[in-house]
Amino acid sequence: MLCFLDDIQKVYSIVNPNLTDGKHVMAQKGDEETISFVDVVLGLSREENIDLYVTGSNSKMLSADIITEFRDKATNIALAPLSFQEYFNYVGGSASEAMYDYIQFGGMPLAVLKPDEEKREYLKGLFETTYFSDIIEHNTLRKSESLDELCNIVSTQSGELLNAEKIANTYKSVKKEKIDKQTVEKYLGYFKDAFIIREAKRYDLKGRNEIGALRKYYFIDTGLRNARLNFAFPDEGQMLENVVFNELVYKGYSVNVGCFDTVEKNKNGNSIRKTNEVDFYATKGIRKYYIQVSADISNAEARAREIKPYLLLNDEVTKLVVINRPVKESLDENGFTIIGITDFLLKYI
């Protein structure tokens, strides 16, 4: 028998009725003999022929809390908005048109069912009344301008290499006031715990190890990111990266930002160290991909920029350039695969 319990963690704990002549007495802080929702769930889990699922708000319990409260007696199932493949399976039609809508509005299931204008209002409300409210309630915060502004900064700079210091400096330039790095790191942790953002760490493609404090942040849903910015026209490259990152994570890949150093000559003939970047280094078992994501590479300068890191990498990892154009998968003269984003998401990975 399937049994779903939604928001049971919001119920109040009571004193053990054996100590209160069977009466239900609300537990107070410090009471030892209490019965909480955890006890109820564990009791139900011991019943035969019950497949038990517990859902609810992040304001009361985060995924990290599940491990603490239930120890080895529960499995955490990560749920996410619809991937592009799931979204396209539902809406059908032109893959390119579906991608355009998906970049704007994301894959929140209820948003998908609504007309465009209602999608905008729904996603704005979802961000404020669910995601932000959960952060404030779970961490006993007062809704503050600093929390708001930091979320705006991460939204605007999604897909850029960031650390707490860079974000604090941006905050200072925007708000004309200081915020310490510890507060920035704490708030970033809140955003991650509430499943607003995920992070991609830098990975040295030659040293084969994660490096440094710089990392990129991507929204778990592009619609939520755009709602945060009032649906101002997004940077196409950033949003494409976000979609590709999410799809790779959905498909079980470990995803990092690839980087490596080379020594080059500047215009004065002096040797300088230069850091090169590959948008993503994605691995899953024996599958390994370098992935560059671009809106378009028909311009010679853009093409040269995207393939330059690949010309400097002499290894056997599959090298891909994913573009937002309906092109057939092809190999260029250097052996790199060029593929349209919809084919990459729907057929390749």
Language-model-derived ranges and their functions:
Residues I297-P326:
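Basic, amphipathic alpha-helical patches used to engage nucleic acids or provide basic targeting signals
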Residues D116-K288:
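Accessory nucleic acid-recognition modules appended to NTPase machines
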Residues S57-M61, V322-E329:
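Short, polar loop motifs at secondary-structure junctions
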Residues K29-T34, G43-I66, F191:
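Sensor-1/coupling segment of RecA-like P-loop NTPase cores
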Residues M1-T34:
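Conserved P-loop NTPase "ATPase switch" module shared by AAA+ and STAND
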Residues T283-N299, E306:
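Active-site ExK catalytic segment of metal-dependent nucleases
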Residues E48-N49, S57-L161, E165:
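Interdomain motor-coupling "hinge/lid" segment immediately C-terminal to the ATP-binding subdomain
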Residues R325-I349:
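Domain-level recognition of nuclease-like catalytic cores that cleave nucleotide substrates
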